[in-house]
Amino acid sequence: MFPRETKWNISFAGCGFLGVYHIGVASCLREHAPFLVANATHIYGASAGALTATALVTGACLGEAGANIIEVSKEARKRFLGPLHPSFNLVKTIRGCLLKTLPADCHERANGRLGISLTRVSDGENVIISHFSSKDELIQANVCSTFIPVYCGLIPPTLQGVRYVDGGISDNLPLYELKNTITVSPFSGESDICPQDSSTNIHELRVTNTSIQFNLRNLYRLSKALFPPEPMVLREMCKQGYRDGLRFLRRNGLLNQPNPLLALPPVVPQEEDAEEAAVVEERAGEEDQLQPYRKDRILEHLPARLNEALLEACVEPKDLMTTLSNMLPVRLATAMMVPYTLPLESAVSFTIRLLEWLPDVPEDIRWMKEQTGSICQYLVMRAKRKLGDHLPSRLSEQVELRRAQSLPSVPLSCATYSEALPNWVRNNLSLGDALAKWEECQRQLLLGLFCTNVAFPPDALRMRAPASPTAADPATPQDPPGLPPC
């Protein structure tokens, strides 16, 4: 049982085009547990979850919000590159949908209750905005929270003079760590309201506070978050969100609203015989047995307005141009002409965006100069720090290497040079003088090595006279000419 006497929050995770799942959950909470929405202290959201949280807090039509998501996905699927096509402007589309859907006093209803997760560009920290001075500021906060770098553009939008990007980058599920926060996510995992996949894999991945279980269904959902699936698939996701919200309410004992259509007693005519009365009683007993099952089946259906809006969004218009464009020869010709039409469409869309960007050019150019300067300064400081750390060590290594390469093995007769070497090294003040002294000592050591006393045997250099029987006295030994004494 969910404790009604305590305070609680609701948090919607960012999920791209899968935000239609949040529409189903929000519709279920608003229909079957309105006190859960009305008495919530805060309702948070990041990226696409911020759009649903805004619609839920401000009282906007959820059916229209769900239809807008499907319309945007259909618009993205029309193009060759999908949402990456140059002519598809997601930021402009989101802004137009919010202007059309939100009421005029939406900022007054959202003040203090709605929390939108943003990522500050300057330091990458997460910021939650809860106060808005106008409807335009509330819409701009949603635009900042849904702005994915490179996917939506290169220059991030501004809110109150600060640049922000997608809130899911820093915190995709705000306040998930609190026990009194009801977390909603379209990925199966440990969120309170999420799909229940029949997978035995216990491993999970946490992406900026969002629990995602490792299974094939979640891989499919991740692939469709930024590249939308077909409209009927999105409608089924909305229905799944509605059923998952209903299961959460049942599990926590919050589904207390009876269905008035099922509570009405059967109408029995006043004039009937006993047999007809018995048949009616028997049918009433069967209805009582089937009532819980029918009640569950009725509750699992989407609300009429939401279902109608989703169906209208999924239906393709039956005009002549649509029929012709769906024909196979036309589609083949369109695909073959893409290399020629894509540059032209890119040039046209680039020109339109440039004209729309003109009012913001001075501010954006100033920001780009500041960012470029800060990046260059950071790179220079980092290079200086690395040079300061490695240069002394490299110099000391080179000096040690020179000593190891220059110092030969000293014989015992030249030990005096090795004993005298540290004295003049310590007494020298200049590195150049020390190196010069070291070269001089090296030359002396080499001369000492090559100047070796050669001891010849006495009989090797003796001048022998021709052998005669009378001359037997040996000659006195003399030093051979040409050899200096050592």
From Swiss-Prot:
Annotated crosslink Glycyl lysine isopeptide (Lys-Gly) (interchain with G-Cter in ubiquitin) location: K92
Loss of function: phenotype: Mice show increased adipose mass and triacylglycerol deposition in multiple tissues. They accumulate large amounts of lipid in the heart, causing cardiac dysfunction and premature death. Conditional knockout in adipose cells results in a marked reduction in the levels and biosynthesis of fatty acid esters of hydroxy fatty acids (FAHFAs) and FAHFA-TGs.
GO CC annotations on file: cytoplasm; cytosol; lipid droplet; nucleoplasm; plasma membrane
EC main group: hydrolase
Tissue spec. comment: Expressed at high levels in white and brown adipose tissue, and to a lesser degree in testis and cardiac muscle. Barely detected in liver, spleen, thymus, kidney, skeletal muscle, and brain. Among the white adipose depots, gonadal fat showed the highest level of expression compared with inguinal and renal white adipose tissues.
PTM annotation, UniProt: Phosphorylation at Ser-406 by PKA is increased during fasting and moderate intensity exercise, and moderately increases lipolytic activity.
Short motif GXGXXG, span: 14-19
Induction: Transiently induced during fasting. cAMP and glucagon may not be involved in the induction during fasting. Induced by dexamethasone. Down-regulated by insulin, isoprotenerol and TNF-alfa. Expression is not affected by glucose and by growth hormone. Expression is reduced in fasted leptin deficient mouse (ob/ob), an obese mouse model. Expression is not affected in fed ob/ob mouse.
Protein name as it appears in the record: Patatin-like phospholipase domain-containing protein 2
Gene name in the database record: Pnpla2
